[in-house]
């Protein structure tokens, strides 16, 4: 097989920004941090899981709504560091967009949630598609770049680029732009 002469240039991304979130109207969503994915993806367990775990502890302490999404067969295989607690929302999804054919939107709106923090595997898949579904439904979205990764640097950058440039584009990464997505980092997220 011959090599392609095509060389792709990575799109540039703005720096992650600090955000201050109201715990009463914010939900932390965690996608696919399960045994078989983590076993195949070292970056998942080594970098992403510790970031999610630390954010999850702070979110629980602040009273943030917590929701989990994965396929039905995987619901019992969450890594212990980020596993669901009693009362957390659990969505058995059928597609990358966690809103597609699920009751996630109803569950969040019943709790008065307006802002979502999207975390988990993977930024170019579930997180990107759910960010589109969320902004179409009127949510403001925060994506902490250390808490949602992918198999390659290319997929990470493309996922983040798509998140900022979908629907209500936020190409400059304006913090908490309404009905759009913001790139942040777990240490830049404050609950107040």
Residue ranges, per PLM feature:
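A cross-domain feature marking catalytic cores of carbohydrate-active enzymes
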Residues: 33, 68-71, 145
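Short acidic, Gly/Ser-rich segments with clustered Asp/Glu that frequently serve as metal-coordination loops
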Residues: 34-40
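Short hydrophobic beta-strand that contains or immediately precedes a catalytic carboxylate
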Residues: 29-31
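A short alpha/beta connector and helix-capping loop motif
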Residues: 24, 41-59, 63-72
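Active-site-adjacent betaalpha module
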Residues: 2-27, 54, 61, 73-192
């Amino acid at each position: 097989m011959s090599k392609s002469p095509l060389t792709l240039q990575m799109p540039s991304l703005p720096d992650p920004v600090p955000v201050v979130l109201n715990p009463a109207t914010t939900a932390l969503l965690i996608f696919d941090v399960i045994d078989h994915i983590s076993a195949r993806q070292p970056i998942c367990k080594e970098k992403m899981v510790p970031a999610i775990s630390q954010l999850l502890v702070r979110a629980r302490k602040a009273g943030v709504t917590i929701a989990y999404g994965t396929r039905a067969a995987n619901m019992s295989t969450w890594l212990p560091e980020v596993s669901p607690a009693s009362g957390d929302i659990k969505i058995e999804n059928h597609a990358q967009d966690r809103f597609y054919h699920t009751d996630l939107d109803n569950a969040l709106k019943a709790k008065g949630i307006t802002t979502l923090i999207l975390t988990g595997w993977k930024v170019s898949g579930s997180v990107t598609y759910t960010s589109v579904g969320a902004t179409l439904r009127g949510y403001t979205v925060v994506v902490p770049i250390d808490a949602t990764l992918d198999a390659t640097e290319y997929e990470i950058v493309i996922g983040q680029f798509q998140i900022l440039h979908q629907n209500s584009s936020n190409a400059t990464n304006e913090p908490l732009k309404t009905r759009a997505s913001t790139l942040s980092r777990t240490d830049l997220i404050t609950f107040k």
